[in-house]
Amino acid sequence: KTPGHPELDTKLGIDITTGPLGQGFATGVGLALAESYLSKTFGDKIINHFTYGIVSDGDLMEGLSQEAAELAALWGLGKLIYIFDDNNISIDGNVDKVSVTNQKTKFESFGWDVQSIDGHDENEIIKAVNNAKANTSQPSLIIAKSTIGKFSPNKENTSGVHGSPLGEEEMKQFLENLAWTDDLFEHPKEVYGYFDEKLSLIHI
């Protein structure tokens, strides 16, 4: 139910097929463009929302995302907000082995509003999103510095946790580090309640 490249399934809340790396980034730009056009056409009392996305190192390394990012700035899509999970890891290893791009400088040169935060601090995330929402003249990139596989004792900050299972023993130690005492696939009732509420809002 959680493929690496999600495909259209409105019952699961998946509105679009995003395809390979970078395509989801470009699709988000298209969604933000649609919001801008429809809001201007029918008025912001009818159409008025933000477009959010979480993007990866791999997404931003693709040429497709660069072209879309330039257009987003050119079109002034100020209600587009992306959080960049900046963990410096790709499926092949450290990103700095294959890329020299400073994403902050690149996006600023395009005309995006760029913020840098600690990706593990929820208060910084909330503050950055609110700052981005307050600036509707530019698309926003929030660079959230993070550690992939955090709390995994042997695979933290490695490509070994990128798209691969931790393994039984590693998962056991990972859960111990999180002080997780419930069964692996058991989650608090509050989690189910929250998602059930959100799913009820989806119109199929």
Residue ranges and their predicted role:
Residues 1-74:
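Cofactor-binding active-site loop characterized by glycine-rich and histidine/acidic residues
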Residues 10-12, 22, 38, 42-44, ...:
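General N-terminal targeting signals
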Residues 47-49, 76-77, 135-138:
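Short, well-ordered loop/turn elements at secondary-structure boundaries
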Residues 54-55, 59-63, 81-83, 87-202:
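Conserved acidic/glycine
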Residues 73-81:
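Boundary/activation segment at the start of structured domains
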